[in-house]
């Protein structure tokens, strides 16, 4: 049985969206147990009772405006902290939260801990492509500043995730840059390019541009945390803007527009599904000793369900256990 600890109080619509997502997951998957951390009375008002769901009550939670590291240290009984502690103590196999991103990353690093050999775990998410296959990108903001060695390791981590979680035999690795030529970019990008090009274990395809990401140019895209986060927000904003513009155009377009929308209904739903990044799950802080997944702060029940599904896949494939073994081999070689 796969045990998942969930911060029920994190996110814009907690605990309602969190608990309703849990209800869907419990109904869909018979091999998971959920531990919900938070206000018991509020959780119970939305929970469909199940012997595979338990509640650990706490009145304390980390707010969106709390300073991450201080909150983790001072709010020792916060729902997020208790969920992370359950993983560290072996009472749960993975942790999920839609709460304060910085605090969750701090909980991952300070409570769960890094895998030996991983310098800086990267925040990885699967983002949409027009053909529906998606691509993995990291780092999405766990680290504002990176060295070339960090980005090389992100490529290794991303390739490993794509292979073991998404089932891509030879993931194509692209380096996000301001042009596709090998000579493009600043000194950091040029140094990273040389690292990746000389690593025979990676299927490195060269530099990729932001405009080509959603066309599926690569299976894994490597970026420093600052740039990756900016691109992530751009993709999210573009997806929301496109759907908003379509709705607005149909609403004010009169009878012809509404009739046209009716004829295109299935195609519009397909477009909506293609642009819906939440269906791929949350962002993984990959490189920790256990799966830690951040769901979007505005996640609804559907997004929480898909994030639980993602965590279940990570546990089913034992991707973290295999990653520990992989880095253990590298450490032995380096020693």
From Swiss-Prot:
Its main location: cytoplasm. Keywords: Cytoplasm, Lipid biosynthesis, Lipid metabolism, Phospholipid biosynthesis, Phospholipid metabolism, Transferase. Pathway: Lipid metabolism; phospholipid metabolism. Pfam families: FA_synthesis. It comes from the Bacteria. It is an enzyme of class 2 (transferase). Its EC number is 2.3.1.274. InterPro entries: FA_synthesis, Phospholipid_synth_PlsX-like. It is found in: Cytoplasm. One of its GO terms (molecular function) is phosphate:acyl-[acyl carrier protein] acyltransferase activity. Coiled coil: none annotated. One of its GO terms (cellular component) is cytoplasm. One of its GO terms (biological process) is fatty acid biosynthetic process. Homodimer. Probably interacts with PlsY. NCBIfam families: plsX (TIGR00182). Belongs to the PlsX family. PANTHER family: FATTY ACID/PHOSPHOLIPID SYNTHESIS PROTEIN PLSX, PHOSPHATE ACYLTRANSFERASE. This is Phosphate acyltransferase. It comes from Streptococcus equi subsp. equi (strain 4047). The lineage of its organism: Bacteria, Bacillati, Bacillota, Bacilli, Lactobacillales. The gene is plsX.
């Amino acid at each position: 049985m796969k045990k998942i600890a969930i911060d029920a109080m994190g996110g814009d619509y907690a605990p309602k969206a969190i608990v309703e997502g849990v209800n869907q997951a419990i109904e869909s998957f018979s091999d998971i147990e959920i531990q919900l951390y938070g206000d018991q009375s509020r959780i119970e008002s939305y929970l469909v009772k199940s012997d595979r769901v338990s509640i650990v009550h706490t009145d304390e939670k980390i707010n969106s405006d709390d300073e991450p590291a201080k909150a983790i240290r001072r709010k020792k009984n916060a729902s997020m902290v208790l969920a992370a502690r359950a993983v560290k103590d072996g009472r749960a196999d993975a942790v999920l939260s839609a709460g304060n991103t910085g605090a969750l990353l701090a909980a991952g690093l300070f409570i769960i801990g890094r895998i030996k050999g991983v310098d800086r775990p990267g925040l990885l998410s699967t983002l949409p492509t027009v053909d529906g296959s998606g691509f993995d990108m990291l780092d999405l903001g766990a680290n504002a500043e990176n060295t070339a060695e960090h980005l090389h390791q992100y490529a290794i981590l991303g390739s490993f995730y794509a292979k073991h979680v998404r089932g891509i035999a030879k993931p194509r690795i692209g380096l996000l840059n301001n042009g596709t030529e090998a000579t493009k970019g600043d000194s950091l990008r040029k140094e990273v390019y040389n690292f990746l090009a000389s690593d025979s274990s990676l299927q490195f395809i060269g530099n990729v541009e932001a405009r080509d990401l959603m066309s599926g140019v690569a299976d894994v895209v490597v970026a420093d945390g600052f740039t990756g986060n900016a691109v992530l927000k751009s993709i999210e904003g573009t997806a929301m803007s496109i759907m908003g513009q379509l709705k607005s155009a149909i609403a004010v377009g009169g009878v012809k527009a509404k009739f046209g929308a009716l004829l295109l209904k299935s195609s519009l739903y397909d477009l909506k599904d293609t642009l819906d990044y939440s269906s791929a799950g949350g962002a993984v802080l990959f490189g920790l000793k256990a799966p830690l997944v951040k769901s979007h702060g505005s996640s609804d029940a559907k997004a929480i369900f898909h994030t639980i599904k993602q965590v279940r896949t990570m546990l089913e494939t034992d991707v973290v256990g295999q990653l520990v073994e992989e880095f253990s081999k590298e450490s032995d070689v380096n020693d």
